[in-house]
Amino acid sequence: MAEPTEKRLVSETGVAARVAQIVEGPIEGLGFRLVRVKISNTNGRTVQIMAERPDGTMGVDECEAVSRAISPILDLEDPVGDAYYLEVSSPGIDRPLVRVSDFERWAGYEAKVELAVPMDGRKRFRGIIGVPSADGTTVPIDLPDVKPGLPSRIDVPLRDLGEAHLVLTDELIRESLRRGSAPPQDGEEGDEEEGAEAEHEAPQVRFIPQPKRPKPKLDKKSDKPVKAKKPKPGGGIVTKAARLKNRDTLH
């Protein structure tokens, strides 16, 4: 069974790496796991933190608990500097795969994998992932429509993993709903008509409090606070999963 302290295979860079370093411990202390930190400039600067329980589930109440725990810590450490929105969310259906246990849990489903180091001159792969090796160093991928003479299955070294995520399919939606790792869509068990239209439309549970503002900076000459830039209007990232956002997002 996956543990909260299982190390991730990937890591952030820059400000996102600093945020991850600050929040990972407190998140684990609540019994959750950090999945990913991403910083974007959509609708004002947004710090998106993905988290989950060790079993892969995450509800809006859990997102709120994580947000309330890490918010004062981020206020104190101030890793971003500028005004920003803090968004805590579940990984979603087409979730990132960041731990060996993620690959184990979702073996048999389609994923996109990108390596930091090329393998046989290639970095990007898409196919059905298998169960990782016993020592957790490689994961097999069955490749569709390969050219004659090329292997249909490869073993990808996880030490070279740059990024990986599940591909949104009707089968994945149904299985995610069955496992409880995705919220139901308007009382239905998956939307087969719209399910596989786009890989980045998978709904997520989100908690977006009021925008965070940086500590006031003092003018060196007058010793008076310098006026901070105001964030752009709008609450967090606007997604195409509008029904879910209206139902599950708290402000």
From Swiss-Prot:
<dbReference type="InterPro" id="IPR003728">
    <property type="entry name" value="Ribosome_maturation_RimP"/>
</dbReference>
<dbReference type="InterPro" id="IPR036847">
    <property type="entry name" value="RimP_C_sf"/>
</dbReference>
<dbReference type="GO" id="GO:0000028">
    <property type="term" value="P:ribosomal small subunit assembly"/>
</dbReference>
<dbReference type="InterPro" id="IPR035956">
    <property type="entry name" value="RimP_N_sf"/>
</dbReference>
<dbReference type="GO" id="GO:0005829">
    <property type="term" value="C:cytosol"/>
</dbReference>
<feature type="compositionally biased region" description="Basic and acidic residues">
    <location>
        <begin position="216"/>
        <end position="226"/>
    </location>
</feature>
<comment type="function">
    <text>Required for maturation of 30S ribosomal subunits.</text>
</comment>
<keyword id="KW-0690">Ribosome biogenesis</keyword>
<feature type="compositionally biased region" description="Acidic residues">
    <location>
        <begin position="186"/>
        <end position="196"/>
    </location>
</feature>
<dbReference type="InterPro" id="IPR028998">
    <property type="entry name" value="RimP_C"/>
</dbReference>
<dbReference type="GO" id="GO:0006412">
    <property type="term" value="P:translation"/>
</dbReference>
<dbReference type="InterPro" id="IPR028989">
    <property type="entry name" value="RimP_N"/>
</dbReference>
<protein>
    <recommendedName>
        <fullName>Ribosome maturation factor RimP</fullName>
    </recommendedName>
</protein>
<feature type="region of interest" description="Disordered">
    <location>
        <begin position="176"/>
        <end position="251"/>
    </location>
</feature>
<dbReference type="Pfam" id="PF02576">
    <property type="entry name" value="RimP_N"/>
</dbReference>
<keyword id="KW-0963">Cytoplasm</keyword>
<comment type="similarity">
    <text>Belongs to the RimP family.</text>
</comment>
<dbReference type="Pfam" id="PF17384">
    <property type="entry name" value="DUF150_C"/>
</dbReference>
